[in-house]
Regions:
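Hydrophobic residues within beta-strands of alpha/beta enzymes
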Residues: 100-102, 134, 159-161, 229, ...
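Short pre-active-site segment immediately N-terminal to redox-active cysteine/selenocysteine motifs
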Residues: 58-65
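Conserved alpha-helical substructure of the radical SAM core
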Residues: 73-100
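Short coil/turn segments at secondary-structure boundaries
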Residues: 53, 57, 75-83, 109-113
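Conserved radical SAM core fold
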Residues: 75, 101-111, 141-144, 157-180, ...
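Auxiliary Fe-S-binding modules of radical SAM enzymes
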Residues: 1-54, 58, 70, 86-93, ...
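Short, surface-exposed recognition loops or helix-turn segments adjacent to catalytic cores
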Residues: 131-144
Length: 293
C-alpha cells in the first residue's frame, strides 16, 4: 500500500462554472444519476464545465460489489424507472450536448440484465436529439450474447466495456461474478455483430499490476478488435475500497500510451486523471464517429 501523500499530478480542480451548475440542476430536475458524481470521478469539474456528462441508468444500486468502486451496492428488487429513457433524452436536448455517454449499474436482478432499458435509452436520445453521438459503457450482462445483441441493434456509435485491471488482479479487484475472459468475449461479440461499431475499454493502474501483464492486456484487447483504450490512475474513493498500491508517474502513462498505440488502437487516452469516459466527445473521436452515422 502506498503510504506517500497524494502527488500533485492526481489532484483535480474543484468543479465550477455556469455549465456545471446548470447540469447539476437538470440532474436534480429529472431525478437522474451521473457516474461523474456516483463514482467520485476526479474530472467532474472539467467535463461538466464543458457540458459533457456520463448518465448512469437503472438506478443508484448495483447488484455487484467491485472493490474499487464507490457506487452503492444493494438489491434493486427488479425496479426500473420506465420514464428514465425519455428523461435522459430531454436532458440531453436541453443541454445541447453533441456527445453523450450512457452507462449503468449492474442489474443481475433483471431477466436481461437491463439490456432492453439500455436500448430504449439509446433510441429515445436518437429520436429527440438525432445529431448527438452516443457512447455506451455496458456491463457484461452475465455473458449473455442475446443481451449484447439487443444493445448493438440500438446502434450506438461506441460500445465500451471495461476490463478494469489485468487478469491476475481481476479476482482481487472486481466482483466474483466478473471475469477477465468474459469481458473480452463481450467486446469480441460486439465486433462480430457489427464491425462498424467502435469498441472501447479501460484500465486502472496503481493496484499492484505488473508491466508485463499490462502489456499483455493491451494485446488481448487488440486481439478481439478493441478500437479505443483509456488508462488512468486508481484513486481510492473511500476507506472500504482497495488501497492505492502505487501512484503511477505521468511519464509512465506516456510510455503505456506509446506501447498501446504501436499495437494499433485507433485512440488511446493515458494519464493519471483519465477515466473511461474522459473527454469522450473530443474532436478526434467525434470526427471518426460521425461519418458512419
Amino acid at each position: 500500500m502506498s503510504s506517500s501523500p497524494k502527488p500533485d499530478w492526481v489532484r483535480a480542480k474543484a468543479p465550477v462554472g455556469p455549465t456545471h451548475a446548470r447540469l447539476k440542476e437538470l440532474m436534480k430536475q429529472y431525478s437522474l444519476h451521473t457516474v461523474c458524481e456516483e463514482a467520485c470521478c476526479p474530472n467532474v469539474g472539467e467535463c461538466w464545465g464543458s457540458g459533457t456528462a456520463t448518465f448512469m441508468i437503472m438506478g443508484e444500486f448495483c447488484t455487484r460489489a467491485c472493490r474499487f468502486c464507490n457506487v452503492k451496492s444493494g438489491k434493486p428488487n427488479g425496479m426500473l424507472d420506465p420514464e428514465e429513457p425519455a428523461k435522459i433524452a430531454s436532458a440531453v436536448k436541453d443541454l445541447g450536448l453533441k456527445y453523450v455517454v450512457i452507462t449503468s449499474v449492474d442489474r443481475d436482478d433483471l431477466p436481461d440484465g437491463g439490456a432492453s432499458h439500455f436500448a430504449k435509452t439509446i433510441t429515445s436520445v436518437r429520436t429527440l436529439a438525432p445529431d448527438v453521438s452516443v457512447e455506451t459503457l455496458i456491463p457484461d450482462f452475465g455473458g449473455g450474447l442475446k443481451e449484447i445483441q439487443t444493445v448493438v441493434q440500438a446502434a450506438p456509435d461506441v460500445i465500451g466495456h471495461n476490463l478494469e485491471t489485468t487478469e491476475p488482479l481481476t479476482l482481487k479487484v472486481r466482483d466474483p461474478r466478473a471475469s477477465y475472459r468474459q469481458s473480452l468475449e463481450v467486446l469480441e461479440h460486439v465486433k462480430q455483430l457489427d464491425k462498424r461499431v467502435f469498441t472501447k475499454s479501460s484500465l486502472m493502474l496503481g493496484l499492484g499490476e505488473r508491466e508485463e501483464d499490462v502489456l499483455r492486456t493491451f494485446r488481448d484487447l487488440r486481439a478481439v478488435g478493441t478500437d479505443f483504450l483509456t488508462l488512468g490512475q486508481y484513486l481510492r474513493p473511500s476507506q472500504r475500497n482497495l488501497p492505492v498500491i502505487e501512484y503511477i508517474k505521468p511519464e509512465r502513462f506516456s510510455y503505456y500510451q506509446r506501447a498501446a498505440e504501436q499495437l494499433g488502437f485507433l485512440y488511446v487516452a493515458s494519464g493519471p486523471l483519465v477515466r473511461s469516459s474522459y473527454r469522450a466527445g473530443e474532436y478526434f473521436l467525434h470526427r471518426m464517429i460521425k461519418p458512419i452515422t
